[in-house]
Amino acid sequence: MIGKLTGTLLEKNPPEVLVDCHGVGYEVQVPMSTFYNLPAVGERVQLLTQFIVREDAQLLYGFGSAPERQAFRELIKISGVGPRTALSILSGMGVDDLAQAVSLQEAGRLVKVPGIGKKTAERLLLELKGKLGVDIGARPEAANDAQADILQALLALGYNDKEGTAALKALPKDVGVSEGIKLALKALAK
């Protein structure tokens, strides 16, 4: 499986980009939230990816953040929601907006996304509840800036909020960022 691409951005044709990684060009489908944050053509880019093999195609989807990729993974597990629909959802609303809509059970916000009807929106609300890891109110405020930075680093490394928060609780209160990340990673490795 291809988990991450780092290379030169060759083309940007929404929602697809072409990334050159050491002479191999990868066509990657990205949500518009990621597309708008991409650097200019010719610059270095890094995307977290999800590789999907179908009977008639091998497709690569790219994301600017671990929570966005995780939301995509949760979305495509839902019956009736394929990769194209999941990209449409993430393009129409960010991960935080999606998590808030799920947390507050607001089907009306999901229906505004092209291709999402009332029944699909209700199924999304039901099946995503508690699975995005960024539910509103689920994340306790970090005690200080260092802990917030440590949590952000853990999220960027692919851990979810629950794992990150549990690792933070095991750390001394006055730990620095770099030492805290090391200790948190050791705790999560157990």
Curated annotation (Swiss-Prot):
Gene3D superfamilies: 5' to 3' exonuclease, C-terminal subdomain, DNA helicase RuvA subunit, C-terminal domain, Nucleic acid-binding proteins. Residues 1-64 are annotated as: Domain I. Residues 137-141 are annotated as: Flexible linker. Residues 142-190 are annotated as: Domain III. GO terms for molecular function: ATP binding; four-way junction DNA binding; four-way junction helicase activity. The keyword tRNA processing does not apply. Residues 65-137 are annotated as: Domain II. It is found in: Cytoplasm. One of its GO terms (biological process) is DNA recombination. InterPro entries: DNA_helicase_Holl-junc_RuvA_I, Hlx-hairpin-Hlx_DNA-bd_motif, NA-bd_OB-fold, RuvA, RuvA_2-like, RuvA_C, RuvA_C_sf. It comes from the Bacteria. Its main location: cytoplasm. Pfam families: HHH_5 (PF14520), RuvA_C (PF07499), RuvA_N (PF01330). One of its GO terms (cellular component) is cytoplasm. Belongs to the RuvA family. Homotetramer. Forms an RuvA(8)-RuvB(12)-Holliday junction (HJ) complex. HJ DNA is sandwiched between 2 RuvA tetramers; dsDNA enters through RuvA and exits via RuvB. An RuvB hexamer assembles on each DNA strand where it exits the tetramer. Each RuvB hexamer is contacted by two RuvA subunits (via domain III) on 2 adjacent RuvB subunits; this complex drives branch migration. In the full resolvosome a probable DNA-RuvA(4)-RuvB(12)-RuvC(2) complex forms which resolves the HJ. HAMAP family: DNA_HJ_migration_RuvA. The RuvA-RuvB-RuvC complex processes Holliday junction (HJ) DNA during genetic recombination and DNA repair, while the RuvA-RuvB complex plays an important role in the rescue of blocked DNA replication forks via replication fork reversal (RFR). RuvA specifically binds to HJ cruciform DNA, conferring on it an open structure. The RuvB hexamer acts as an ATP-dependent pump, pulling dsDNA into and through the RuvAB complex. HJ branch migration allows RuvC to scan DNA until it finds its consensus sequence, where it cleaves and resolves the cruciform DNA. Has three domains with a flexible linker between the domains II and III and assumes an 'L' shape. Domain III is highly mobile and contacts RuvB. This is Holliday junction branch migration complex subunit RuvA. It comes from Paracidovorax citrulli (strain AAC00-1). The gene is ruvA.
